[in-house]
């Protein structure tokens, strides 16, 4: 296992951490290193870039949704055959679940994993003041191991030298390089953040250009040197090897549905599920021998016209759920199962039609934040009076004129609310779950799939 890992932390959002992280990954890979990516927090989109540039599946590490031991194990497992791990932070270094603690922050992740930190500082229109910013971050949480700085948005090499001299004199840590303002290399954004790489097609030229830019102005070998960290010890592994498959769960996965945590898949496999992917966008049906169905989040609204035209696919999904497949649909998957998606131009696209009501897109954020979740009575995922953690992030609202059964009670910063839709074997809602927050959910789902499979066989 590699003992080199580095947290890329920003003084705030928009530094920009993601562009720099991708550039560092590309430059390290070009230098011959095997790079493993991680993303602090629940975001699905940035890891798609990490995965594309490193050619290794990037992992989310979230210290609010997951127990600290699980965070450490995820890092240790994924880093086993890597030369260096790059962990992209979220928001500002100390920003997390609430403003009064470090819970869920990049800083907390750095402490949990005992990882050195490279601080990215926006140095536009300042020189010595940059040192004051860095010193403030050092003193705010002295136990955080900030080992170096990257100066971002510098105006020239001369400007960089001023910033570097001030920081190194006052803060006693190296400034390992800089990036100039370069709008041409800014990754485009959209209502859910960065466009998933799966939609952008061929990204190799972009990665190469960004990697070369980082190589030209950042000391990559110094970065590698600073990444040396203590080995993470795992005493009682949570993740186990996949067991012999007992049920088959179909997973909708393409450009419209691609928001999944890799650990969710691994926990399902460890519990006896074989996962079979299909693409609704490409006209692929739910596999006939599937015993369960998982439709994750994504951008169905961006592909609403194409999805609306996939009549056979919609019939296939509807028939699979109606015949009893235990189904979980999260956010985009939930939207897909409604009567229709109404886009911001008031065009309505017909969807599967199993959930009575429509989803209406809007320009303003409808919901954002972590959720503590309990299931409503009859929710098979929550058998045994369990709780789970997840998050919401969407620009749409669900409207229905019919009575229906919510799937969950969720608790966020604004209090409790009922959320989602439940009907027998169908559980759907805006909430994205990390199964690592409650592995019992996985056991419940697989057991429900086994029971449904037996019931169908007995009926033959």
From Swiss-Prot:
The a and c carboxylates of cobyrinate are activated for nucleophilic attack via formation of a phosphorylated intermediate by ATP. CbiA catalyzes first the amidation of the c-carboxylate, and then that of the a-carboxylate. This is Cobyrinate a,c-diamide synthase. Keywords: ATP-binding, Cobalamin biosynthesis, Glutamine amidotransferase, Ligase, Magnesium, Nucleotide-binding. The keyword Amino-acid biosynthesis does not apply. Residues 248-440 form the GATase cobBQ-type domain. GO terms for biological process: cobalamin biosynthetic process. Comprises of two domains. The C-terminal domain contains the binding site for glutamine and catalyzes the hydrolysis of this substrate to glutamate and ammonia. The N-terminal domain is anticipated to bind ATP and cobyrinate and catalyzes the ultimate synthesis of the diamide product. The ammonia produced via the glutaminase domain is probably translocated to the adjacent domain via a molecular tunnel, where it reacts with an activated intermediate. It catalyses: cob(II)yrinate + 2 L-glutamine + 2 ATP + 2 H2O = cob(II)yrinate a,c diamide + 2 L-glutamate + 2 ADP + 2 phosphate + 2 H(+). Belongs to the CobB/CbiA family. Its cofactor is Mg(2+). Pathway: Cofactor biosynthesis; adenosylcobalamin biosynthesis; cob(II)yrinate a,c-diamide from sirohydrochlorin (anaerobic route): step 10/10. The record marks 432 as: Increases nucleophilicity of active site Cys. HAMAP family: CobB_CbiA. The gene is cbiA. Pfam families: CbiA (PF01656), GATase_3 (PF07685). Coiled coil: none annotated. The active site is at residue 331. PROSITE patterns: GATASE_COBBQ (PS51274). Its EC number is 6.3.5.11. Catalyzes the ATP-dependent amidation of the two carboxylate groups at positions a and c of cobyrinate, using either L-glutamine or ammonia as the nitrogen source. One of its GO terms (molecular function) is ATP binding. The keyword Ligase applies.
